[in-house]
Amino acid sequence: MDPSAPQPRAETSGKDIWHPGERCLAPSPDNGKLCEASIKSITVDENGKSFAVVLYADFQERKIPLKQLQEVKFVKDCPRNLIFDDEDLEKPYFPNRKFPSSSVAFKLSDNGDSIPYTINRYLRDYQREGTRFLYGHYIHGGGCILGDDMGLGKTVQVISFLAAVLHKKGTREDIENNMPEFLLRSMKKEPLSSTAKKMFLIVAPLSVLYNWKDELDTWGYFRVTVLHGNRKDNELIRVKQRKCEIALTTYETLRLCLDELNSLEWSAVIVDEAHRIKNPKARVTEVMKALKCNVRIGLTGTILQNNMKELWCVMDWAVPGLLGSGTYFKKQFSDPVEHGQRHTATKRELATGRKAMQRLAKKMSGWFLRRTKTLIKDQLPKKEDRMVYCSLTDFQKAVYQTVLETEDVTLILQSSEPCTCRSGQKRRNCCYKTNSHGETVKTLYLSYLTVLQKVANHVALLQAASTSKQQETLIKRICDQVFSRFPDFVQKSKDAAFETLSDPKYSGKMKVLQQLLNHCRKNRDKVLLFSFSTKLLDVLQQYCMASGLDYRRLDGSTKSEERLKIVKEFNSTQDVNICLVSTMAGGLGLNFVGANVVVLFDPTWNPANDLQAIDRAYRIGQCRDVKVLRLISLGTVEEIMYLRQIYKQQLHCVVVGSENAKRYFEAVQGSKEHQGELFGIHNLFKFRSQGSCLTKDILEREGQVEAGIMTATTWLKEGPPAHKLEMPRQPDCQECRGTEQAAEPLAKEACDLCSDFSDEEPVGATGIKTAKNKAPDSSKASSSPGQLTLLQCGFSKLLETKCKAVEDSDGNTASDDESSDEQPTCLSTEAKDAGCEKNQDSLGTSKHQKLDNILNPKEKHIFYKSEKILEQNISSKSDEKKIKNTDKHCILQNVTESEDSDVICPTQYTTERFPDNSIRFKPPLEGSEDSETEHTVKTRNNDNSRNTDDKRNGIISKKLSPENTTLKSILKRKGTSDISDESDDIEISSKSRVRKRASSLRFKRIKETKKELHNSPKTMNKTNQVYAANEDHNSQFIDDYSSSDESLSVSHFSFSKQSHRPRTIRDRTSFSSKLPSHNKKNSTFIPRKPMKCSNEKVVNQEQSYESMDKFLDGVQEVAYIHSNQNVIGSSKAENHMSRWAAHDVFELKQFSQLPANIAVCSSKTYKEKVDADTLPHTKKGQQPSEGSISLPLYISNPVNQKKKKVYHTNQTTFIIGETPKGIRRKQFEEMASYFNSSSVNEFAKHITNATSEERQKMLRDFYASQYPEVKEFFVDSVSQFNNSSFEKGEQRTRKKSDKRESLIKPRLSDSETLSFKDSTNKISQVCSLKTYKRKSVKFQNHISYREEVFFNDAETKKSPVSSTQEIDSGKNSQASEDTVTSRSLNSESETRERRLENTMKDQQDLTRTGISRKEPLLKLENKKIENPVLENTSVISLLGDTSILDDLFKSHGNSPTQLPKKVLSGPMEKAKQRPKDFWDILNEQNDESLSKLTDLAVIETLCEKAPLAAPFKRREEPATSLWKSNEKFLWKKFSPSDTDENATNTQSTT
């Protein structure tokens, strides 16, 4: 090679660039044929043409144009003159990998910066996008955060960005450019000065520091130096001389060398694991913020690990000031989001939280980029993630309880109470700062928390030597106190410490682990066993040694060079099938793809640690499906740790993922008012020794809400309920088999059957447990202003019990009162049944009609009368009684304006009650994760359909029995979970979900059906299981109860299996239905005994899961299992609730204080829907009356004054009714100041509670102080309005009622026509005043008035109806900020109570006739009693004062939409002169009292004590009524002076 020759830059057709020394094909000087030669030098002539001096094999030289040279195609045997060719020198180059994309550079900008083709060919699209994101912020001189999930290649994206900015090519050219400058000059190649000036600093944890260097060396030719260890001073000199391009250092070294590094000019600072910058007060945060570089790039997959303050800290480092100050961020984002995430949040809290979430996401969107693992789902195997709750051994329980009973723990628990010395300070800050040994409460708190964690894992851990003398002293004292009760254990520990530590009998988890390892060894599974505690790893290691298992161990003490050796041995050696790994030490940089079972022996407080541990095996390169088992000690502090993980992960989903995450908890981290079930020392130092599972209770509670929402959603999508849905009701009527194909499309439209949840049904072991679990929900739901109605408290059982005789006689439920349980959104089974029922007579003519068609009420009545209920195989009388008591009525939900507008209204019209054991449901197994899958309905003959059903559906078809009923009900519930994902990381195809779901519903006594199941994989997707509906909800937990509740044992929920473990099908079931399996990411309860469901493609995997299920089923210490895959994230039901909360609060400005779990329709939506539904049925020339469309929204301060008037004085003109909203708000604030209120909110509350006269006087005084002449016509305006509105309103009401009657009559039966007509009259009376679009008085403010209009009839007494200001803001400009107060919960309750006073008589009549809620509350004089059997049944006679039950019976005809009745404003005092009734017990909010309500005898006693004349007595003697008499008396008698009660309304109370 001639070093003086000019460098080649000419391009040829064969190759872009030629270099001296390269081999080529050149024309032979003899015959012109191409032959091999080598380039000696390259020259350029005078004309600019490039020539190469080539040297042939015979040493001849010849000058040939570069264009004639061609590249040599190497052959294996071809001799090489050079050691490396260009391909060998390319970086990166993975010869065994195919290029994912073409080998072209990826252009980032027009100035020439691009990702070199050597790197770009291995990148995926999302990685190029990430590189472009980093480059964009670098160009603009700002920072950013790359927040991709673990395993998506953040390191590669950064390297791509560096290669582009440093103009790397990944070829020989980079080698030449990296040569020293004197060599470059000798080659007559000038170094690029611009590139030389660029220098980047990468800060990373020590554990991954050298991994960064390896990656940089692999992916390109970078000049890298490592600033760490002994050589950091020498390397720092090189950095100062700018002899490197990239400097690598650690957080600690950066802190030590901050001044030196700040003296250099860095092009950008890149920080790996940026979530370390999470504490504003931490030293590492201060150091990072002190770096003098504006381009700060952070890399983290978990930017939010514990709270939102961490997010702010990281973002404030990368982009200072982006999210404001810490105080501003907490007020604007953190508090609203966290409070809106509460399970008991109000609509305003939820809507405000979601709005804050969206604002935060919008604010961060340009500076924060996050992608999830769904991008690489096709490269990852399946993951089965399960929580395994292990019962403690008796010895563990005793020790755990003993620790909690120590004096120190008592001191901790009482530390926050007021000191006994009455100083006003807390005990821990006054007389009880330390214990008798001088240890502070804080020290004791942390020490005893550690002790409880040790006992929950293995009692022998208390005997282990501690790391510090203080800890050792404390542990010794605790052991002396605790083990004084167990001398045998202490003696054995001294004599045989090794044996004690390795003996599983001292730990419930160890017993489970022992059988798990044996199971994995048989199946040749390789197990990664993680533990956070190294002391616990010692115990596990000793167990492995005692068991003769070949294992490896890796923890923080393992040297770095040995780590890779251990990983390699474990992955490659078959004999080593267990590796003990420390959760923290093994969290980063380890690749255990050889393992397919991951066991987390103990949880950590930070969910990111556990996820990192799982990702050691579940990552790209894993060939087998991964099973993750997390062991949790039941009822201990570990359960709180896991639930806090869920809390943090849900918060991460909201803030980082901008998802409407499910709201499981009532707790808010850092809030003393909302410690809920998670936070506070009382939750940590608690032991649930009865075997109950807090996790199960919380997930079930959320599942009930979700199920109710989604069930209502299905109803709301079904259209006008005017037609029949053909479905045979009789249990022995055979289903037609030729309709499978026709039924398939109905899968998308049928009702969602996975929400058959009933709070009144027994949970776990006893029915009393249910009451205890649900009572707190009731009280917390009413924590917002408003008292729960009996509708929300599950009151239907009492009414149903009294009507049992009628039900048994004619198959029709006479009582039409219904309940939706404590959870307002939880619907009973019949709600779904009603949407899916078919008329038996129509079976032969039409098999599967559209689900828009609902059985006509008249036809239902006739049908039920002619049908005999078949009570099938009830095991005992107590069972029958319990089943009847658990029956509920359905709540048919209203229809909204679109399919996505799904709401739940607590008071809607109902369908008839269904006979037991008659309906079968067939939920389809097909469904995508993003679309709601609903379910069709079928029936089948119990006697004749066994063969066909078995072959088609793969279920056990026997004659209906408690066992079989239970099986089918459980199958049905689990079968509906196909809408959910299989993994929080991965989307699973529909077929996989089908198989997995079926495989997870297995029972011990159904092996005989497995062969049949393997015959129909295709049919299963279409025709799935047929299930019992009523038994489904009756036996949601088990139909087969024994005489003692305590003996009921369920495999997953029987927490004391030693004494209760019957091996029967009925008792070996798991109740997945308690969780909302309909939703995308919901938790599911995993049954113990799997039932095979075959598909050839995944049969091996299913067998693997079945094998694991079978193993877990046989472990006695496993108390409860649930899948962790669908717990985290959002759901469709939560999306509905969030959307409607925002709609109600921000658009309609109403219902803001209702619980967020209740969705409410607007009158606008209702009107549009009713117009669409009613118009086709209207006769020619007849329009639907306005009164029949409007809703009776009862508000305590309605606005009736809607006239627009103008008053003229000498110099001033006053316009009434057209005040702009801005002026209204402004003058309302002035009014608050005028009346010396401390705030606008206080003034709004004062107005709400003030009497009519007080409000009138306040308005007059305020405006008269500015305009004295206002006082003259102020009152006249009101009185004028009152008179005209009363007269005209009554006339218009009657006209509209007549129209509505003629409109509805053709579709109703005789009795229904009459009752509906009355309801129409009543509705019209409420809403007819809406026609008078009188505007509010405008004195540069919005003045509104209110009146109560009484409609009296000579024969029938009507209720006082308060006309409301029109909610439809499009109709009335007065729907403004002022009206929000009138929509507040207290106001609504007040008016509703006024209405109730005068409706007692009609309510009695209604109750006697047993009319459903499709029928009205008010009756005309010509009432007809449809069912004489119930004529003498009076709810008033049963309960006493039943006026509070008004909304139970309130209905508005066949209208598809109905606003809910408002809950009461608060608990009311019981009158002294009457006995305690049902409502008094509910007001006590006492778990014990509420649990009594499940006892039929108690309810009967209450009914007997109830006074009969209470409602009439109230009218005569208000002072002795249910409510106290005072200035704020809710049912105050009407007087003309009340018309001045219309004060200016504000949105403050909302």
From Swiss-Prot:
Alphabetical UniProt keywords: ATP-binding, Centromere, Chromosome, Cytoplasm, Cytoskeleton, DNA damage, DNA repair, DNA-binding, Helicase, Hydrolase, Mitochondrion, Nucleotide-binding, Nucleus, Phosphoprotein
Keyword Ligase: no
GO cellular component: centrosome; chromosome, centromeric region; cytoplasm; mitochondrion; nucleus; protein-containing complex
Domain Helicase C-terminal: 512-662
Distribution of this protein across tissues and organs: Expressed in bone marrow (at protein level).
Chain intervals with Polar residues compositional bias: 1359-1388
Biased composition (Basic and acidic residues): 12-22, 830-840, 933-953, 1389-1405
Record-level GO BP terms: cellular response to reactive oxygen species; DNA damage response; double-strand break repair via classical nonhomologous end joining; interstrand cross-link repair
Organism superkingdom: Eukaryota
Free-text domain note: The atypical PIP-box motif mediates interaction with PCNA. The helicase C-terminal domaine drives nuclear localization and recruitment to damaged sites.
Family: Belongs to the SNF2/RAD54 helicase family.
Function: Promotes double-strand break (DSB) end-joining and facilitates programmed recombination by controlling how DNA ends are joined in a spatially oriented manner during repair. Also plays a role in DNA repair by restricting DNA end resection in double strand break (DSB) repair. Facilitates replication of complex DNA regions and regulates the maintenance of chromatin structure.
Protein name listed in UniProt: DNA excision repair protein ERCC-6-like 2
Origin species: Homo sapiens (Human)
